[in-house]
Amino acid sequence: MSIQVFCDFDGTITNNDNIMSIMEKFAPPEAEEVKNRILSQELSIQEGVSQLFQLIPTNLHDEIIQFLIETAEIRNGFHEFIQFVNENNISFYVISGGMDFFVYPLLQGLIPKEQIYCNETDFSNEYITVNWPHPCDRHCQNHCGLCKSSLIRKLGDTNDFHIVIGDSITDLQAAKQADKVFARDFLITKCEENHISYTPFETFHDVQTELKHLLEVKL
C-alpha cells in the first residue's frame, strides 16, 4: 500500500483564496451574490466559477498576474512538507479548482507541472472563459468543474491510502472518499455537517507532524 496526497491550492497551499482575491479586486459588485450562491450550494461550482470569471475583462490579464505575484503567500511549512513527501516517496498531487494562469506561475520551481491539475482559461474574447479539462466521471453528478473525487479515482489505486488536504466546499467530495482528511476553514464546517472525520491544520508543519506519525504506525 502506498500513500497518495491530494492537496488543494487556493486557501490551502496559499494563505488566501486567489479566486476570491481576484474577484474582490477586479470583479463588479454582482460577484458577491454569485460567490454566496456557490457557498450555499445553490449554484454548482462549475456554473458559479464560470459566472464569476465571465465578469472579468480579459484585458486585465497582466494586471491580475502582477497583483497575485505581489499578494499570494505560500502557507508556512509547505516547502519543508514537499521535501518530506519527496524524501519518503509519497505521491503528491495538486488538485486545484484554480486557474492555470496563476496556479502554474505560483508553484513554479516547487511542484512539477505534471503533478498539477487545474482549470484552463481562455483570454481570446472580451471576458475570461473557463475551460474544464477534468470533469466529473460517471460516479459524480455534482458538476464540480474540476472534479477532485474523479481525479482521485483516476490517479489512485483502491489499495492506496488517500490523504486529502483542503479548506473549502470545493474539497468536500474528495474528502468524502479520503482515508484521512486535513481540513481548515469552511471545509471543517462541511466535514462536521457530513460526519467526515478530519484533522484540523493551520500550517504544513501540522500536516507533516501527523503524516510522519502515520508513516511510523503503518510501517
UniProtKB/Swiss-Prot annotation:
InterPro entries, alphabetized: HAD-like_hydrolase_phosphatase (IPR050849), HAD-like_sf (IPR036412), HAD-SF_hydro_IB_MtnX (IPR017718), HAD_hydro_PyrdxlP_Pase-like (IPR006384), HAD_sf (IPR023214)
Signal peptide: none
CDD domains per record: HAD_Pase
Example GO biological process: L-methionine salvage from methylthioadenosine
GO molecular function terms attached to this record: 2-hydroxy-3-keto-5-methylthiopentenyl-1-phosphate phosphatase activity
Entry EC no(s): 3.1.3.87
Keyword Translocase on entry: no
Protein keywords: Amino-acid biosynthesis, Hydrolase, Methionine biosynthesis
Top-level enzyme category: hydrolase
Pfam families: HAD
Reactions performed catalytically: 2-hydroxy-5-methylsulfanyl-3-oxopent-1-enyl phosphate + H2O = 1,2-dihydroxy-5-(methylsulfanyl)pent-1-en-3-one + phosphate
Pathway: Amino-acid biosynthesis; L-methionine biosynthesis via salvage pathway; L-methionine from S-methyl-5-thio-alpha-D-ribose 1-phosphate: step 4/6
Keyword field contains Membrane: no
Source taxon at top rank: Bacteria
Family: Belongs to the HAD-like hydrolase superfamily. MtnX family.
HAMAP family named in the record: Salvage_MtnX
Function comment: Dephosphorylates 2-hydroxy-3-keto-5-methylthiopentenyl-1-phosphate (HK-MTPenyl-1-P) yielding 1,2-dihydroxy-3-keto-5-methylthiopentene (DHK-MTPene).
Protein name: 2-hydroxy-3-keto-5-methylthiopentenyl-1-phosphate phosphatase
Lineage of producing organism: Bacteria, Bacillati, Bacillota, Bacilli, Bacillales
